[in-house]
Amino acid sequence: MRNYIPDRGDVVWIDMHPQAGHEQAGRRPAIVLSPSSYNAKVGLALFCPVTNQIKGYPFEVIIPSGLKVTGAILSDQVKSLDWKIRNTEFYDKVPETVIFETFKKLATLLRFNG
């Protein structure tokens, strides 16, 4: 997909190198959080990695069955990445309910009472 632009809700394969510490690494599936309008204009996109190692952490979002990808979205590991140089490839699309649940967990994490 040479003209592919990642869009919110897409499941993509992306190179997560380099990484450090507890961050997810390697070529792996990730969920796109940002809309294609932003991604196309800026050349960056917001991603959350997907893991098959479900551990019951409070910020995991379980991916429903019936999709190509399985496991959980790590909503507390948001990354802004240059999707063009990281060999981003479309793989699947998650239902809107999954994106909504991911955003709810992010809102909880980022809550600010200033």
Describe the role of every protein-language-model region.
Residues 1-114:
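Conserved functional hotspots at enzyme active or ligand-binding sites that engage polyanionic ligands
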